């Protein structure tokens, strides 16, 4: 019996396991129920009582040896397979990584910010949920001004005995916050998201983006405002752009104006985009109203300033000849992929 055990031990030791097939052959020959080693355990009943301890010890050692060899071989095979999977064929082309593209609205906003930053403007932001005081009162809006009506503004809270809370309708409240916190000179742009209770159409949306600018210092004049707007328009729309200022009205500026540029599509000759006028409106502006300066603790007898504001989506519509503002909010890759 001991000679048979030694013979099978030699067979297990000499058996080469190089892959899964040879490992399975080893298992079937030595380890399964009808394999060589289990069959030796079946023959233990024929061993004399005196020899059983020694034979049993040899059998247990044989089984441990065979099990260990099989386990070690399987681990080695698995490690080799894993290493083979990790091998890279350096002759193959690399995998293409599809990166997202900057949204056209953000492209335009980024260009605007860079232009004004070169002029010395810093950037300020503020909350999108705003108090009535910052959104209307301190900006010289009369109590019965149409903009305060629920038909034009989204109210978060509207109570008779408490201050209204609204979704800001412009980024002008940021200018108020800056003037309340900072002494002149002030030169700042205020980009951000604004909200209007308007019907959604190809030309209007209930959410859009604005960029407003403010400059307050001693001796600021309308000529300074015109110079700033001219410089911006030439850098944004081209050096050959023509401009005109039209008188307008805003509660927070006096005098006020709206600025038109020659239609960049038709060169001022008239087309569908400019409604055959040859001109496109790009922004509103004016000299900061003395009441607004007083509301912010700035003496209008000493300081003056100008402010301007424009819609980012509107500028993007003009720049990219897009005819529907809703496309900016639909995340349609067929449209957005054109700006990669």
Curated annotation (Swiss-Prot):
Chemical reaction(s) catalysed: tRNA(Phe) + L-phenylalanine + ATP = L-phenylalanyl-tRNA(Phe) + AMP + diphosphate + H(+)
Alphabetized PROSITE patterns for the sequence: AA_TRNA_LIGASE_II
SUPFAM superfamilies, A to Z: Class II aaRS and biotin synthetases (SSF55681), tRNA-binding arm (SSF46589)
Alphabetized Pfam families for the sequence: Phe_tRNA-synt_N, tRNA-synt_2d
Keyword Translocase among record annotations: no
Keywords: Aminoacyl-tRNA synthetase, ATP-binding, Cytoplasm, Ligase, Magnesium, Metal-binding, Nucleotide-binding, Protein biosynthesis
GO molecular function, one term: phenylalanine-tRNA ligase activity
Compartments in which it is found: Cytoplasm
One of the GO biological process terms: phenylalanyl-tRNA aminoacylation
Cellular component, GO annotation: cytoplasm
Superkingdom, taxonomy of origin: Bacteria
InterPro entries xrefs: aa-tRNA-synth_II, aa-tRNA-synth_II/BPL/LPL, Phe-tRNA-synth_IIc_asu, Phe-tRNA_ligase_II_N, Phe_tRNA_ligase_alpha1_bac, Phenylalanyl-tRNA_Synthase, tRNA-bd_arm
Protein family (similarity comment): Belongs to the class-II aminoacyl-tRNA synthetase family. Phe-tRNA synthetase alpha subunit type 1 subfamily.
PANTHER family from the UniProt entry: PHENYLALANINE--TRNA LIGASE, MITOCHONDRIAL, PHENYLALANYL-TRNA SYNTHETASE
Name of the protein in its database record: Phenylalanine--tRNA ligase alpha subunit
């Amino acid at each position: 019996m001991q000679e048979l055990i030694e013979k099978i031990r030699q067979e297990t030791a000499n058996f080469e396991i190089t892959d899964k097939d040879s490992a399975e052959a080893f298992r079937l020959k030595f380890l399964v129920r009808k394999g060589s080693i289990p069959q030796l355990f079946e023959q233990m009943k024929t061993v004399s009582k005196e020899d059983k301890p020694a034979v049993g010890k040899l059998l247990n050692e044989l089984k441990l040896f065979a099990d260990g060899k099989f386990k070690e071989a399987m681990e080695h095979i698995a490690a080799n397979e894993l290493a083979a999977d990790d091998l890279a064929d350096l002759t193959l082309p690399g995998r293409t990584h599809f990166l997202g593209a900057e949204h056209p609205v953000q492209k335009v906003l980024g260009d605007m910010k860079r232009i004004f930053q070169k002029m010395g403007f810093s950037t300020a932001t503020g909350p999108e949920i705003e108090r009535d005081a910052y959104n209307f009162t301190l900006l010289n809006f009369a109590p019965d001004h149409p903009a305060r009506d629920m038909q034009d503004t989204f109210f978060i809270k509207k109570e008779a005995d408490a201050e209204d809370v609204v979704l800001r309708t412009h980024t002008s409240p940021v200018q108020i916050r800056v003037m309340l916190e900072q002494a002149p000179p002030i030169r700042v742009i205020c980009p951000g998201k604004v909200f209007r209770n308007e019907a959604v159409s190809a030309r209007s949306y209930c959410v859009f983006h604005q960029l407003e600018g403010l400059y307050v210092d001693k001796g600021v004049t309308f000529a300074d405002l015109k110079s700033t707007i001219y410089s911006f328009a030439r850098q944004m729309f081209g050096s050959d752009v023509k401009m005109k200022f039209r008188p307008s009205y805003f509660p927070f500026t006096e005098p006020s104006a709206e600025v038109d540029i020659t239609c960049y599509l038709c060169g001022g000759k008239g087309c569908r985009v400019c409604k055959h006028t040859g001109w496109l409106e790009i922004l509103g502006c004016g000299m900061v109203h003395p009441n607004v300066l007083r509301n912010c603790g700035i003496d209008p007898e000493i300081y003056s300033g100008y402010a301007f504001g424009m819609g980012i989506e509107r500028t993007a519509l003009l720049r990219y000849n897009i005819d529907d503002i809703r496309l900016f909010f639909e995340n349609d890759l067929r449209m957005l992929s054109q700006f990669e």
